[in-house]
């Protein structure tokens, strides 16, 4: 028996050696192919990035979302078009943005490797193929059109009033307010009520804290890791909730809360209860014109998960960044109040966003808030399958993932001089001179894959700014520009230290 065991050990080691050698040979051959035979072999860029995902993995996973700044360095060395990994081209040219993020004139897919980490394969946001995406977006577009958002305006204003009453409470008690948490509660209340027909009143929670947001923020921390290893996230998602809770409590809470919402909707539908008739998900589930496979509760639940994230954290951050800069510059605050005072017959501070969109200085403040908060800060590659793209002397083969980074577009000094300065006046001046700066706001991306909730987000930002600016005096508390400066690129931008929340004290109610 001992002889048998001793013989099996060398055999086992030999087998392991063969496996390791085979895998190493595969990696070496793959690297050689990527360097010398790959269709992108002639594009400029560092050889280390071209051999595979290792270079990007080091900067984004090991160094916590720093690959963007390495890409910026690459562009300084190699020019405006760079091969940033084995398969992807990155372009640093804001004028080329609308070519990559194209409209209906071209079929544009998403890149599988870029959306796999989201673990919501049936959501529009994670849908790869152009035709499937167009079908899924056509289902939801009517609910997020400008007309639909206008009909939703009273509900938005009701939640803003609720936030104002909470802010007034903090004023009486001299409490510090985390605006990021407050605005996240506001936007989450609006989007969950509209999409699911259920008002969770996150604004009523102490400190505006709610577990769904904590879960989302926790998942953002792991975005890059799950981007390289999506199978891990998908495996965790399939585990029973008690086991999932041991591994990742935030993910467990998010999944369990979504299941509770689904159960509530099932019960409502089974009873023929029309109380939720205005919710997006119930209307979609009951719409016979939608193909059956596209109106299942699981698929629309995936849509809801992405809408809660996209409709909560990014809009909330734009509001926080904007309020910081407005409060930090008394001249800007004064100009905004004077402009709001020009609106006729508004004594209560309750506005229509159609009115507010006509105010040039406020519009400039809204656009600067979006520009300096960036929205999703990650690369979002697009794939033109049916045609080659041309950039300068380079022909980009069909099927190649191509991206531009929002942060680099928003901080381009040729488009936005002194790009880190919050300057609503630049938009007023551009409008007077007939210059279209709007096309360089990429917070919602562009083209057929543009963010579904763009109209809702703009309405929320306009209405919230107007109400808070006219209702309260506030002072910034223990927050500096460094807290807003993007250093780490996770799913959204993050500062060098901490979480970068904007804190204020409400000192006076003036309306």
From Swiss-Prot:
Chain positions recorded as heme binding sites: 451
Its EC number(s): 1.-.-.-
Task: State the annotated membrane topology for this chain.
Answer: Single-pass membrane protein
Query: Which superkingdom heads the taxonomic lineage of this protein's source?
Result: Eukaryota
Q: What family does the database annotate?
A: Belongs to the cytochrome P450 family.
MF terms in GO: heme binding; iron ion binding; monooxygenase activity; oxidoreductase activity, acting on paired donors, with incorporation or reduction of molecular oxygen
Listed cofactors: heme
* GO CC annotation: membrane
What is the name of the protein in this document?
Answer: Cytochrome P450 monooxygenase flvD
Which reactions are catalysed by this chain?
(1R,4R,5S)-acoradiene + 2 reduced [NADPH--hemoprotein reductase] + 2 O2 = 2,6,9-trimethyl-13-oxatetracyclo[6.3.1.1(6,9).0(1,5)]tridecane carbocation + 2 oxidized [NADPH--hemoprotein reductase] + 3 H2O + H(+)
Gene for this chain: flvD
UniProt keyword terms in alphabetical order: Heme, Iron, Membrane, Metal-binding, Monooxygenase, Oxidoreductase, Transmembrane, Transmembrane helix
Q: Under which pathway is this protein filed?
A: Secondary metabolite biosynthesis; terpenoid biosynthesis
InterPro entries, from UniProt?
Answer: Cyt_P450 (IPR001128), Cyt_P450_E_grp-I (IPR002401), Cyt_P450_sf (IPR036396), Cytochrome_P450_monoxygenase (IPR050121)
Residue ranges crossing the lipid bilayer per the database entry: 13-35
What does the protein in this record do?
Answer: Cytochrome P450 monooxygenase; part of the gene cluster that mediates the biosynthesis of flavunoidine, an alkaloidal terpenoid with a tetracyclic cage-like core connected to dimethylcadaverine via a C-N bond and acylated with 5,5-dimethyl-L-pipecolate. The tetracyclic core is synthesized by the terpene cyclase flvE and the cytochrome P450 monooxygenase flvD.
List locations, semicolon-separated: Membrane
Q: Which organism is it from?
A: Aspergillus flavus (strain ATCC 200026 / FGSC A1120 / IAM 13836 / NRRL 3357 / JCM 12722 / SRRC 167)
């Amino acid at each position: 028996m001992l002889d048998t065991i001793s013989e099996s050990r060398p055999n086992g080691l030999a087998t392991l050696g063969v496996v390791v050698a085979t895998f190493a040979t595969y990696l070496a051959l793959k690297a050689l192919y990527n360097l010398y035979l790959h269709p992108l072999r002639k594009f400029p860029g560092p050889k280390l990035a071209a051999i595979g995902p290792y270079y990007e993995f080091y900067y984004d996973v090991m160094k916590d979302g720093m690959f963007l700044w390495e890409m910026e360095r690459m562009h300084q060395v190699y020019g405006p078009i760079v091969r940033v990994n084995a398969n992807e081209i990155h372009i640093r040219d804001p004028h080329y943005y609308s070519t990559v993020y194209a409209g209906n004139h071209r079929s544009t897919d998403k890149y599988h490797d870029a959306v796999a980490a989201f673990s919501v394969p049936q959501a529009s946001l994670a849908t790869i193929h152009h035709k499937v995406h167009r079908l899924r977006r056509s289902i939801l577009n009517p609910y997020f059109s400008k007309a639909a958002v206008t009909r939703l305006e009273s509900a938005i204003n009701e939640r803003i009033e609720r936030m104002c009453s909470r802010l007034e409470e903090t004023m009486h008690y001299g409490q510090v307010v985390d605006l990021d948490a407050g605005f996240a509660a506001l936007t989450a209340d609006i989007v969950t009520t509209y999409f699911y027909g259920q008002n969770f009143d996150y604004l009523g929670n102490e400190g505006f804290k709610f577990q769904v947001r904590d879960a989302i923020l926790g998942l953002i921390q792991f975005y890059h890791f799950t981007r390289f290893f999506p199978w891990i996230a998908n495996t965790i998602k399939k585990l029973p909730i008690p086991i999932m809770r041991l591994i990742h409590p935030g993910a467990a809470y998010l999944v369990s809360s979504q299941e509770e919402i689904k159960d509530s909707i099932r019960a409502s539908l089974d009873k023929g209860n029309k109380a939720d008739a205005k919710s997006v998900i119930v209307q979609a589930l009951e719409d016979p014109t939608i193909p059956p496979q596209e109106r299942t509760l699981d698929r629309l639940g995936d849509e809801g998960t992405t809408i809660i994230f996209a409709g909560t954290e990014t809009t909330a951050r734009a509001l926080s960044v904007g309020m910081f800069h407005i409060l930090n510059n008394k001249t800007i605050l004064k100009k905004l109040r004077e402009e709001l005072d020009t609106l006729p017959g508004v004594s209560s501070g309750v506005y229509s966003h159609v009115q507010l969109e006509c105010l040039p200085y406020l519009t400039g403040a809204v656009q600067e808030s979006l520009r300096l908060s960036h929205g999703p800060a990650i690369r979002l590659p697009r794939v033109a399958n049916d045609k080659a793209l041309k950039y300068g002397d380079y022909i980009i083969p069909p099927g190649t993932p191509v991206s531009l980074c929002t942060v680099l577009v928003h901080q381009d000094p040729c488009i936005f001089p002194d790009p880190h300065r919050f300057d609503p006046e630049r938009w007023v001046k551009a409008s007077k001179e007939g210059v279209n700066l709007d096309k360089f706001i990429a917070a919602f991306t562009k083209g057929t894959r543009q963010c579904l909730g763009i109209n809702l987000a703009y309405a929320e930002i306009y209405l919230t700014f107007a109400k808070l600016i006219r209702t309260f005096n506030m002072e910034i508390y223990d927050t500096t520009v460094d807290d807003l400066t993007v250093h780490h690129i996770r799913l959204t931008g993050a500062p060098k230290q901490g979480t970068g929340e904007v804190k204020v004290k409400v000192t006076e109610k003036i309306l």
